[in-house]
Amino acid sequence: MTGIIGAMEAEVQSLCDSLEGRTQIEEGGYVFNKGKLFNKDVVVVKSGIGKVNSALCTQLLILKFGVNQVINTGIAGATGGNLGIFDFVVSSKALYHDFDTTAFGYKPGQVPGMDPEFIADEKLSDLVIKAFSQMDFSKEHKIVKGLVASGDQF
């Protein structure tokens, strides 16, 4: 089963509305929307803004629903000039943009004791790219694969 997380209602509402056989389950202060999307079992949930909310929600998806893959969807900023509104970015790796221990010899974004970057599941990333390319949406928008950054600074 696949879990799909969005921080805000606007990021998950159309997915929830598209679920076939939708049921809602309340757990831990979250409303999980379970159903089928393109004949695949999914659980869609609004996590709330921030890394902690996303982590808590992801843990509940794993423990309560047995998801084996999690997709985070939503609105984001970009540092590159080659992306437009509604373009897709699929991560190849991720890092924190709001964590700085460089004074202690760590790389920017690196949490002590952890790798400086988190490597994405290449198989899942490739599936997302394949699915995107099969949608009419892909004719008007592009998809790129690369480094993404996460943080709680706005």
Q: What do the predicted segments below correspond to?
A:
Residues 14-20, 36-40:
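A short, Lys/Arg-enriched amphipathic alpha-helix followed by its capping loop at the start of a domain
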Residues 4-5, 148:
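Short, hydrophobic beta-strand segments that form beta-sheet elements in well-ordered domains
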Residues 1-3, 42:
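Extreme N-terminal starter segment of soluble prokaryotic enzymes
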